[in-house]
């Protein structure tokens, strides 16, 4: 009940207060959400012409950046990004019934539910670790984070991927039958592959599984992640990896990756210092306890996924997107904090006794 209340307050607050902050788009309808909205509208029976007009008119009055859109530019045979977005079908499919009922506002339902899944998942992690009160506090703090709510409630796929990642962590912790766990985690990876490019994240988790002596599941899940990534990679080999460096050629791009990673680290940390100091403190705390307790499962997963999402942001090539591509780190951050604080509480209790 408490989680739902704080989620509702966060969602209603976001509906009421959204716009530009320091020139950054904290609105609900983002530029790449145009394509997801267009696809959902065509799925419910609108022609491309009608869908383009609906999106164009809506963005003109409800978006804050790049809100002047030529309706024909959104058509499947016109927009240059459809090759990249073609495989990102899960969000439009799930949103289609809500778009049918509520129009363009229906595109906000899945992101809102994704936020609820994230918050309940953190509570579930805390219950499993017998640290439910701190888990509740973390979920509440996350619902108040301006950066997290910026992306989780917007009409983009990052919130959905974060929700799936949260379910992955919960399933990993609660399902002990290895075959059932393999099936469940594999299904989540497949669904995640249809949100946006997430293969680096999944492979990092598979490395963690391997280190936890779950070698069979690690290898099989890694194969699943690669198999469902390959079709997207083949369609977007030039534009999917450091798209801003297309002129340098594919062979030269690895050399650019290090520079891109340095830029991502500088801008992401700088933006969080300005916009969300509490979030960056939680991340640094999780990093510190993970390094200190490196033998723990949660520590390994947090550090591996942190590196993977850092690389993902660098590969994308868009600098200064304010933690957007690192959003799936949140459930692992909670996992690390909750496990480490539980251990410290137990140690202090034994000392007193």
Feature locations, PLM:
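Specific aromatic-rich, kink-prone transmembrane helix
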Residues: 121, 160-177, 184-188, 332-336
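Hydrophobic, aromatic-rich transmembrane alpha-helices
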Residues: 276-303, 309-311
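Start-transfer (signal-anchor) and selected internal transmembrane alpha helices
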Residues: 1-19, 24-26, 216, 220, ...
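Transmembrane-helix motifs of polytopic, lipid-linked glycan transferases
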Residues: 109-130
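Short acidic/glycine- and proline-prone juxtamembrane loop motifs at membrane-interface regions
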Residues: 150-160, 322-323
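Membrane-interface alpha helices of multi-pass inner-membrane proteins
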Residues: 181-197, 203-208
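Interfacial juxtamembrane loops and adjacent helix segments
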Residues: 42-87
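Membrane-lumen/periplasm interface segments of specific transmembrane helices
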Residues: 215-288
